[in-house]
Amino acid sequence: MATLINFNDTNKLLLTKQPSLFIDLASKDWIASANQAIKQRGAFYVALSGGKTPLEIYKDIVINKDKLIDPSKIFLFWGDERLAPITSSESNYGQAMSILRDLNIPDEQIFRMETENPDGAKKYQELIENKIPDASFDMIMLGLGEDGHTLSLFSNTSALEEENDLVVFNSVPHLETERMTLTFPCVHKGKHVVVYVQGENKKPILKSVFFSEGREEKLYPIERVGRDRSPLFWIISPESYDIADFDNISSIYKMDIL
């Protein structure tokens, strides 16, 4: 079982009731998004997320690859990347491709972020603008950090204020590093933007994002993603939320599925 909640104009939440269902629904949503885009415009442009949770989703996608109508029409991009070799366990590209190679996507449709290139952000933006109609991804996969960051958009960093560029290098002082990341202008162009929340350690930040009474300002980067025309879609594992927090939401905004 899972419950779909229209929380507000900019956020839709899918609360899964079993950990295994979380991965299953995330994978099905990805495959459905791919098939819909391929049917509608002959290609699926997706920005992948790093982290452990997406790797589980990728594995399930590969297991169910026979449900993809045409993997050769998939174009892979990344939402952010560390300054790490592609052979490193820190490389979002390397970790994802160790799994997604089994989809047999043409190499010329796989675009990694070249963090070793000082002009890499500019080059990646040009790729997005040249390859993707209107620079609008069909799907953008996001994670949620315990501090409320998403992609490599951390609080108190310059990338949060970027209004024009779609891709930047973002200095993250508290991590003593720099990362390449998509920006809010790029994410806001996305057709289907999904954030995956898994782990009991995410419960405090999720509660703070949705149930901080009396707080009007947006404290966390993740809160700046959703838009009225394209609400942020949350897929949430059961250990990451307290169901009691949602009891006061009217049933007209809830729908049980499965």
Curated annotation (Swiss-Prot):
Pfam families: Glucosamine_iso. This is 6-phosphogluconolactonase. It catalyses: 6-phospho-D-glucono-1,5-lactone + H2O = 6-phospho-D-gluconate + H(+). NCBIfam families: pgl. The keyword Zinc does not apply. Hydrolysis of 6-phosphogluconolactone to 6-phosphogluconate. Pathway: Carbohydrate degradation; pentose phosphate pathway; D-ribulose 5-phosphate from D-glucose 6-phosphate (oxidative stage): step 2/3. GO terms for molecular function: 6-phosphogluconolactonase activity. GO terms for biological process: carbohydrate metabolic process; pentose-phosphate shunt. The lineage of its organism: Bacteria, Pseudomonadati, Chlamydiota, Chlamydiia, Chlamydiales. Belongs to the glucosamine/galactosamine-6-phosphate isomerase family. 6-phosphogluconolactonase subfamily. The gene is pgl. Its EC number is 3.1.1.31. The keyword 4Fe-4S does not apply. InterPro entries: 6-phosphogluconolactonase_DevB, Glc/Gal-6P_isomerase, NagB/RpiA_transferase-like, PGLS. Keywords: Hydrolase.
